[in-house]
């Protein structure tokens, strides 16, 4: 970690760690953010990733990780579900807005639909990605909307009180395979991001 921080600071032109910078990096580490992937990138890529860091919206810098793995690829294709607002905490906003990527966002929570449409230009699907297509499932929209989830998975992140207070409604499901066919996704995806508050395994279980 020290080596990585020193490389980052070198790109920023620092030879001594400022207290504010040290506090920022320490806070990132305390929240589980891993910068280990930066140890493997070239100096030129590192400089670009450092420049992009303030633009990153992803909670754990997943967008920067993807760029580092794909050589700062432009024009890639992503699939992300649950997309929420499409910007805050988004793993793909940076890829679309600054690297010309296209893709598919899936988000069944009604509270996000208006903001998602305003924030993104890619394909947006409001069905709930699940292991099968055409089912009607109960959905919980919590007071903290980032934690919205399918009924039956609320125990993952919601307290009993928060679950009881959640707005409930039915959502229509689509399998991952059918979602890709529906929107004519390419045969090879550059990045698949899944954040569904507990139902990830069910989504991928029958995906071939």
Regions found by a protein language model. Give the residues of each.
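Phosphate/nucleotide-binding beta-alpha loop and adjacent structural elements of enzyme active sites
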Residues: 2-208
């Amino acid at each position: 970690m020290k080596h990585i921080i020193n490389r980052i600071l070198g790109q920023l032109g620092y030879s001594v760690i400022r207290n504010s910078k040290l506090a920022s990096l320490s806070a990132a580490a305390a929240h589980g953010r891993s910068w280990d992937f930066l140890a493997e990138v070239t100096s030129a890529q590192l400089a670009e990733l450092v420049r992009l860091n303030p633009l990153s919206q992803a909670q754990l810098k997943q967008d920067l990780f993807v760029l580092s793995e794909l050589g700062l690829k432009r024009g890639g294709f992503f699939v992300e579900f649950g997309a929420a607002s499409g910007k805050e905490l988004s793993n793909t906003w940076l890829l679309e807005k600054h690297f010309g990527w296209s893709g598919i966002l899936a988000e069944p929570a009604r509270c996000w639909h208006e903001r998602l449409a305003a924030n993104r230009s890619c394909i947006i699907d409001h069905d709930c990605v699940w292991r099968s297509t055409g089912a009607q499932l109960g959905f919980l929209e919590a007071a903290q909307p980032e934690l919205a989830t399918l009924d039956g998975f609320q125990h993952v992140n919601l307290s009993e009180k928060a679950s009881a207070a959640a707005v409930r409604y039915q959502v229509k499901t689509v399998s991952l395979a059918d979602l890709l066919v529906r929107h004519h996704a390419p045969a090879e995806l550059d990045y698949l991001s899944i954040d569904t508050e507990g139902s990830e395994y069910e989504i991928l279980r029958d995906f071939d």
